Amino acid sequence: MVKIFQHPLINAKLTTMRSKETSYKDFRDNLNEIASLMVYETLRDYQTKKISITTPMNVKYEGETLDREIVIIPILRAGLGMLNGIMNLVPQARVGHIGMYRNEETNEVVEYFFKIPEVPHDSYIIIVDPMLATGSSACDAIAKLDKLGFNNIKLVCLVGVQQGIDKVTKQFPNVDIYLASKDEKLNEHNYILPGLGDAGDRIFGTKIK
């Protein structure tokens, strides 16, 4: 399943992020706010379990609590920019990290770090990365988690293009993809157009090449 959000709050915040005049701080703030809005919908099919509690009025109440582990896995480094927004909404979630970068000469994905919590294989895994461009980083991350036996993986990105969507859905048809926007295309350097620019540079205030 591919879900592209249509929500006025997300659209307005995303427009702010797209502007080259937006400061690093405002870029980060809007990214976290959009991530919070997106994870709300991403967790819609999460299965809870029934529990019994007593209210301050000494009344028994049959309610719900989270049943399975939720693990947020940002793809470094840009995925870190979405983490706080999600953790504000799901503070009990655990966090893993996958470090990848793209070799600018070969466009190949290079992994340099991988660490995730020891959790059951039916845990709810949410991979986050602002950009879904060629889909190579996402597929490499999903493949590694799939090989470890995780069977409930979702991919949450701000913007993506058809090329990346097709690559992920072809290799991993059971992985749901959530996007704030589907953009037009990639340029000759595999950057998304109209896009956001280099999300990592804009999050962390590093020099934009």
Curated annotation (Swiss-Prot):
A GO BP annotation: uracil salvage
Record: residues binding 5-phospho-alpha-D-ribose 1-diphosphate: R77, R102, D129, P130, M131, L132, A133, T134, G135, S136, S137, D198
GO molecular function: GTP binding; magnesium ion binding; uracil phosphoribosyltransferase activity
Enzyme class: transferase
Cofactor binding: number and manner: Binds 1 Mg(2+) ion per subunit. The magnesium is bound as Mg-PRPP.
Activity regulation as described: Allosterically activated by GTP.
Required cofactor names: Mg(2+)
Catalyses which reaction(s): UMP + diphosphate = 5-phospho-alpha-D-ribose 1-diphosphate + uracil
EC number: 2.4.2.9
InterPro entries: PRibTrfase_dom, PRTase-like, Upp_B, UPRTase/APRTase, Ura_phspho_trans
Role of this protein: Catalyzes the conversion of uracil and 5-phospho-alpha-D-ribose 1-diphosphate (PRPP) to UMP and diphosphate.
HAMAP family cross-referenced by the UniProt entry: Upp_B
Stated family: Belongs to the UPRTase family.
Protein name: Uracil phosphoribosyltransferase
Organism this protein belongs to: Metamycoplasma hominis (Mycoplasma hominis)
